[in-house]
Amino acid sequence: GLLFVWMGAPDAADPSQLPLVPALEDNPDSWTVQDTFRDLPMDAVTLLENVLDVSHVPFTHHKTVGKRENAAPVEASITGEDASGFTAYWEEGPRRGKLGAQSTTFHAPQLMWHDLTAKGFGRILTVVYAVPIRRGECRLFARFPFQFQSAVPRLLIGLRPRWLQHIGNHKVLEDDQVFLHWQERVLERAGGSPAVERSFFMPTTADVYVAALHRWLNANGGEPFAGQPLPPRQSTTALMDRYNSHTIHCRSCSSALTRIRAARPWAWALLWGSAVLLGIQQVSAWNSTGLVTAALSALALRQLDRWEQGLTVGSGQAPRNR
């Protein structure tokens, strides 16, 4: 879950003003929620643009959470718009309508969610809190609530360790992290959000989400840290850093990393021990044991290396390009 902290005078705290998703509050026990977070090398506005824009998923996230063959025109419309944000509706919905219609809410200034109900599966939300840290940096809090029609998916999700789920989340985030980091510098040179209509070409109904976000920014909110320049562009290696942007702050992932590093010497010991057994040619049973132990130890070392990399740094090579 999320813990909200009021930094002002206690008497001024108003729980009714918390940025919450009503559907999750109405019947919280009916939801299975996967949570993650990460510090991202981009402004909160850039993150919100990205997660609001549904049309990029089949292309940018091909082979992670999207497929190019599912791409289709997005006939979306804004259904409500005021100083508190906006709502939108996409009748066909993702995957060429296979998942049903999708509604979107932007709860200004930092919260958005997509909401759909897939026939035969259940209700699915994608919830994002984009929290500004400093110019060019924000913290993402992402929630993935599911309301299943069957108990089986809920059970299967519960069996998966949280740190493995977080590794999967990293892969999706890194699909577009590099060019989003570069993109906001291009927009900054063009004049930022006030110049977005001249800088961006947004002629289709797929663009209504991003256009509405910038209308809200220019009419009500303004960009965080307005007037401050973006920091220098980071290297790809820095952009792929998972350890400092997530793992060091995550109890599940940091504990898993400690266990993985502690297990590696034991796997090496088994591998060397099996080599000794293989060197004893006289006893065939020992040779068989040595071969099995060596194979299992080598596989374990390979998997430990993969998990450690998954918790510390991304490859920098998006699955769509492989």
Regions found by a protein language model. Give the residues of each.
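C-terminal catalytic domain of Rieske-type non-heme iron oxygenases
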Residues: F4, D11-R322
